[in-house]
A protein has these predicted regions:
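HIT superfamily nucleotide-processing domains
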Residues: 1-123
Length: 123
């Protein structure tokens, strides 16, 4: 996809957490061109269907967008989204952040690189 990048960041706390980024500097969602909006719809559809394929079920997720804090131009800001599916190895094995993970460091069942490879195969 030439307008968007989806990646599993090396700092991911959730096993199949992804970061969605436009390939050009954009500070607000309303700055997307029509082409980028259509491409975003396609990328999101592919990503969410990939999660469903990976877990062989309708996969729940939480998604949030980070744009510049106000409508003023913000060339130092990069619009991006985070997608967090709370599943580990199957639709019946959920990830729960507790104790140590909430206060210190996330525990991973697989590396971000392994998660990215599995997700790539599901796409």
């Amino acid at each position: 996809e030439e307008d968007w990048t989806v990646l599993v960041p090396y700092w991911a706390m959730w096993p199949f957490e992804t970061l969605l980024l436009p390939r050009r500097q954009i500070d607000h969602l309303d700055a997307l061109t029509e082409r980028e909006q259509l491409a975003l719809a396609q990328v999101l559809t592919r990503l969410l269907r990939g999660y469903n394929t990976l877990f062989d079920a309708s996969c729940p997720y939480t998604m949030g967008w980070h744009g510049a804090p106000d409508s003023a131009p913000a060339p130092h800001w990069q619009l991006h989204a985070h997608c967090y599916p709370p599943l580990l190895r199957s639709a019946s094995v959920r990830k729960h952040m507790v104790g140590y993970e909430m206060l210190s460091e996330a525990q991973r069942d697989l590396t971000p690189e392994a998660a990215a490879q599995k997700l790539r195969q599901a796409l």
